[in-house]
């Protein structure tokens, strides 16, 4: 079972079971440490953890990603370490359709955890498409709070996105979820999860 799915199930189960001291707050142990998850109606909100590693990707790491995703260096618009615990690195492509067409070479991607983001056309309900590829284990995660939190910090902080945007993830797996990011805050649509700074 994937760690993200396990965490989502545990948090969902905790919200429905027992009587915590404050029924609006659950504290979840994550790689980054303890994360307070606040319930607001059907939404879950949690503070975006600080980035542990930022800055441009090293040339060797970027080359590995380009090769693993079957891209060329000109396909990469921007790249960055966006590690808030799990070790995420990220690349931005020129379009959401390019992101959706990716078919990684898992053997080359190993052991990286790579987030890929690309803009949708203005008429689309989401501003960006996000995919999360985990090289160790060779799988794609359909909904990744830690990645979307760190992408929001990077994209908004670097002026690569507006201060409020919607990102879709899971589309390529027919499991689409929308994350709404405001400032360095984020909410997730069908899972109704919010992330606040």
What is each model feature region?
Residues 1-2, 9-197:
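Active-site proximal loop and beta-alpha junction motif in alpha/beta enzyme cores
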């Amino acid at each position: 079972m994937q760690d993200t799915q396990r965490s989502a199930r545990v948090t969902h189960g905790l919200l429905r079971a027992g009587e915590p001291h404050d029924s609006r707050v659950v504290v979840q142990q994550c790689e980054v440490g303890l994360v307070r998850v606040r319930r607001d109606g059907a939404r879950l909100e949690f503070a975006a953890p600080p980035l542990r590693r930022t800055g441009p990707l090293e040339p060797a790491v970027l080359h590995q990603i380009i090769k693993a995703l079957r891209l060329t260096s000109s396909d990469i618009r921007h790249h960055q370490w966006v590690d808030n615990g799990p070790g995420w690195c990220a690349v931005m492509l020129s379009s959401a359709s390019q992101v959706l067409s990716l078919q990684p070479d898992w053997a080359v991607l190993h052991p990286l955890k790579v987030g890929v983001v690309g803009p949708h056309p203005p008429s689309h309900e989401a501003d960006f498409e996000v995919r999360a590829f985990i090289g160790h284990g060779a799988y794609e995660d359909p909904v990744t709070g830690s990645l979307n939190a760190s992408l929001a910090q990077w994209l908004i902080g670097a002026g690569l996105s507006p201060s409020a945007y919607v990102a879709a993830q899971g589309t390529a797996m027919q499991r689409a979820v929308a994350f709404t990011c405001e400032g360095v805050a984020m909410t997730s649509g069908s899972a109704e999860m919010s992330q606040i700074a």
